[in-house]
A protein has these predicted regions:
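Pre-Walker A segment
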Residues: 67-68
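PLP-dependent class I/II
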Residues: 1-20, 25-63, 75, 79-82, ...
Length: 397
């Protein structure tokens, strides 16, 4: 074969989410876009805060082209990294410096760099908690390691600690946590994070190894009803934070984020250097320079989270009224729904017959559920209820 078989497979087969999205575009050409209820993508629909476009205008008017679009240092612009450190220190009572941050092209790049930096053997394992973002498997395996999955706690969507304990071995390099969670919308409680930190310290001491938490946090600021999202570095020293501004600033196409390597991490400068080395090896040589500058002026800003909350309440109340069993999200912008048959793939195929595009959670490691993205137009949610009711009646009458 002229091309790498594993890469060909990834490139020739879209993810289930992207496949559904493309189907929706084609279906809209047939029946009209207003008749397709596309809940497939987690693509922010709340506008970016005003500071984003205002800062872009200011930068283009005051900086010359070379200063605006030229390379930053490999680890990122110093002013940007210090601004992030200052903001987190003020918000969380931490003591980070600019040297703790490595700027990246979003959380996906951050995770990929961390997996590559930490993997030292084909026997290395990273553990994730179902339901989980399916691309974790792609990123981990591309780094040469193995992904181990802990089954979902479908009562509260926290962590099944008995199942996690069974899966920690001397080969465990890290545990990936995603809170607020895609796809469930759950937020890990402080009790959960404390219990996780205790367990990992215990197991690391037992095996004489280092076990990292990789905190995947693109939804950190999107939380509802006063729910607090614990800042994990305060609970566990060996935490690497993989952050993206895609969701908080509604900038998914601009690809800007960071890896945070606190000084409390064991051999933190070695880990940081390995992440920088992974950036070289993978070709992530410079995060977008203009948007690094934009961040400085927009630190702490978010899109209007209340609009997501309004959609959450509308969708949750509408579907539960019909009879669906749903987990009420505490954060992010996804509703996790128990499917009306055990085969969630089949259920989502049946939903397509009503032009409802929802994502089976089989790929998220949680069969029997479906993800409904509510970062969509409010009117579409309202119009979709008749289709959801028809689907429900097909199973219950």
């Amino acid at each position: 074969m002229i091309a790498a078989e594993d890469m060909y497979r990834l490139g020739s087969q879209r993810s289930a989410i992207r496949e559904l999205f493309e189907y929706g575009k084609k279906r809209a050409e047939v029946v009209g876009v207003e008749n397709v209820y596309d809940f497939s993508l987690g693509n922010p629909t709340v506008p970016a805060p005003d500071c984003v476009n205002e800062t872009i205008r200011e930068l283009t008017q005051t900086l010359d082209s070379i200063s605006l679009h030229g390379y930053t240092s490999a680890q990122g612009d110093l002013v940007t990294r210090q601004a992030i450190a200052d903001y987190l220190n003020q918000t969380h009572g931490t003591h980070f410096t600019a040297d703790d941050f490595y700027m990246t092209m979003g959380a996906a790049a951050s995770l990929s760099l961390c997996f590559r930096a930490l993997t030292t053997s084909r026997e290395d394992e990273f553990i994730t908690i179902a339901p989980f973002f399916p691309e974790y498997r792609v990123f981990v395996e591309a780094a040469g390691a193995k992904l181990v999955v802990v089954p979902a706690d479908t009562k509260a969507f926290q962590i099944d600690f008995a199942a996690l304990t069974e899966r920690i071995t001397p080969h465990t390099k890290g545990v990936i946590i995603n809170s607020p969670n895609n796809p469930s919308g759950a937020v890990y409680s402080e009790e959960t994070i404390e219990k996780l930190a205790f367990l990992l310290r215990k197991k690391a001491n037992e095996y004489g190894t280092e076990i990292f938490i990789l905190a995947d946090e693109p939804y950190r600021e999107i939380a509802y009803d006063g729910v607090e999202v614990p800042f994990v570095t305060k609970y566990y020293d060996n935490t690497l934070v993989c952050y993206s501004y895609s969701k908080s600033l509604s900038l998914p196409g601009e690809r800007i984020g960071y890896v945070l390597v606190p000084k409390e991490v064991t051999e933190s400068r070695m880990v940081y250097a390995a992440i920088a080395g992974a950036g070289r090896a993978l070709g992530y040589v410079c995060a977008p320079s203009m948007f690094q500058k934009v961040l400085v002026k927009c630190m702490g800003q978010t899109g209007d989270v209340e609009l997501y909350k309004k959609n959450r309440d509308l969708l949750y109340e509408g579907l539960t009224k019909i009879g669906y069993e749903c987990f009420k999200p505490q954060g992010a912008f996804y509703l996790f729904v128990k499917t009306l048959e055990e085969d969630s793939d089949a259920f989502c195929e049946n939903a397509k017959e009503e032009d409802l595009l929802i994502v089976s959670a089989t790929g998220f490691g949680c069969p029997g559920y479906a993800r409904i993205s509510y970062c969509v137009d409010e009117d579409m949610i309202k119009r979709s209820f008749a289709a959801f009711e028809r689907l429900y009646k097909r199973y219950r009458t």
